[in-house]
Amino acid sequence: MKKRALPIVIFVISLQQSSQSFAVLDLLDQLFHKILNLSSRSISCSNCLKHRLQIPYFCSLHKGLNTVHKFRSLRTFQQCHELSKSNQKCHLSVMTRQVLRSRIMRALPLIKESLLLAQFLQ
């Protein structure tokens, strides 16, 4: 299982260093969510065209593609949805791409160490 995770992480890092086009950023979003093992059930906001993340309690409202709002419950998600209807700013907590990247970077040494150990034990 861990052997499959490493190429994804390496791919994310190589994408970080390439041009930051919208397509690349969209792909990064998808990869980050897969790496963070988020649920696959979906709650989507029909009022926002930019909402592309079909993952519970995550919403890209108000901040476009650069940040995602992370919610602890369905209630806070619905509050954000209501704010979007009236075009108000959402003041809920935001998880930026930089936070997601730093989590992956911190996990890299552990992944590499696990792979080396697995190869040694084979």
UniProtKB/Swiss-Prot annotation:
Task: Print the keywords alphabetically.
Answer: Host endoplasmic reticulum, Host membrane, Membrane, Secreted, Signal, Virulence
Primary site of residence = secreted
Where, subcellularly, is it found?
Secreted; Host endoplasmic reticulum membrane
Record-level GO cellular component terms: extracellular region; host cell endoplasmic reticulum membrane; membrane
- Cysteine pairs bridged by disulfides in the record: none
Q: Which residues form the signal peptide?
A: 1-21
Q: Where is this motif: RxLR?
A: 72-75
Instruction: Report whether Secreted shows up as a keyword of the record.
Output: yes
Please give the record's comment on domains.
Has the canonical translocation RxLR motif, but lacks the canonical EER motif, which characterizes most oomycete effectors identified so far.
Provide the function of this protein: Secreted effector that dos not suppress the host cell death induced by cell death-inducing proteins.
Q: What family does the Swiss-Prot or TrEMBL record give for this protein?
A: Belongs to the RxLR effector family.
Q: What is the recorded name of this protein?
A: Secreted RxLR effector protein 80
Q: Which organism is it from?
A: Plasmopara viticola
Q: What is the lineage of its organism?
A: Eukaryota, Sar, Stramenopiles, Oomycota, Peronosporales
Which gene name does the record give? RXLR80
